[in-house]
Amino acid sequence: MGHLTPVAAPRLACAFVPTNAQRRATAKRKLERQLERRAKQAKRRRILTIVGGSLAAVAVIVAVVVTVVVNKDDHQSTTSATPTDSASTSPPQAATAPPLPPFKPSANLGANCQYPPSPDKAVKPVKLPRTGKVPTDPAQVSVSMVTNQGNIGLMLANNESPCTVNSFVSLAQQGFFKGTTCHRLTTSPMLAVLQCGDPKGDGTGGPGYQFANEYPTDQYSANDPKLNEPVIYPRGTLAMANAGPNTNSSQFFMVYRDSKLPPQYTVFGTIQADGLTTLDKIAKAGVAGGGEDGKPATEVTITSVLLD
């Protein structure tokens, strides 16, 4: 909240008194400046937003929003589970969130995968994945990710999120992930993930393209309010980080403890038992400098990602 600045009394006999219209115009300009500043900040950060309350009430009542930064270039200015300006400092003690919805394939699943340019340029030279129709068979693709902290076996859900799997496999085969660090670990009760996939290592890098959300987002209609209500992303989930709808790129996160998120983060696989053991070890070491959100205390570097 801004501070009121004392103003010297005017020397004129009749002080200027702003009209209601002038006060409204001043307030409007102040709000526009605040929104502009926030828009610039949001452009530099990818965010995961956990929303409590109803969208319909947002215009009248401030919903409880707990924001955790995904693309974090200034950890000192944004800490774990940082509330927005008018939000509560703690998540609502609501009933347990529902599970992810059952997967129901659409008629056009994998029929037209597109990877348009993203606002940010590629950190590494990379070719676009195959576009257009991609196969959904085999249903699952086994991948071995090797890190300096141990192996993380992955099973990609090609039958549920084929465009995402197509991109991930393409990047893996081009060596995009080799030598990259997992730049973010969260350990809060609401969110327990290890985030990787950025060659810059600070949460701002990607392959120079983006693509649309798939499961579970595609199980809802576009205007369904449940898209903004938390569901459980269970332990062992492999999902994409994003900066909003349809902005998936190379960054992904691995859930090592049940976490609550709106169903707007594409799930494209699961983590094998060896991978969960590795993640548990990384999580046990905690976040560098303490806290619940930041770089892992134990550096995690991906040495290879290979199809089995």
From Swiss-Prot:
Give the EC class as a word.
isomerase
Which residue ranges are recorded for the region named Disordered? 74-123
* Segments forming a coiled coil: none
Per the record, what are the reactions this protein catalyses? [protein]-peptidylproline (omega=180) = [protein]-peptidylproline (omega=0)
User: Which portions of the chain have biased composition (kind: Low complexity)?
Assistant: 77-97
Question: Record's GO cellular component, any one?
Answer: plasma membrane
Report the GO molecular function annotations: peptidyl-prolyl cis-trans isomerase activity
Instruction: Give the matching CDD domains.
Output: cyclophilin
Q: Name one GO biological process term.
A: protein folding
Read off the InterPro entries from this record. Answer: Cyclophilin-like_dom_sf (IPR029000), Cyclophilin-type_PPIase_dom (IPR002130), Cyclophilin_A-like (IPR044666)
Tell me the keywords, alphabetical order: Isomerase, Rotamase
Under Pfam families, the record lists: Pro_isomerase (PF00160)
Q: What is its EC number?
A: 5.2.1.8
Domain annotation PPIase cyclophilin-type: ranges: 139-307
Could you tell me the superkingdom of the organism this chain comes from? Bacteria
UniProt family annotation: Belongs to the cyclophilin-type PPIase family.
Q: What else is known?
A: Was identified as a high-confidence drug target.
Q: What does this protein do?
A: PPIases accelerate the folding of proteins. It catalyzes the cis-trans isomerization of proline imidic peptide bonds in oligopeptides.
Full protein name: Probable peptidyl-prolyl cis-trans isomerase B
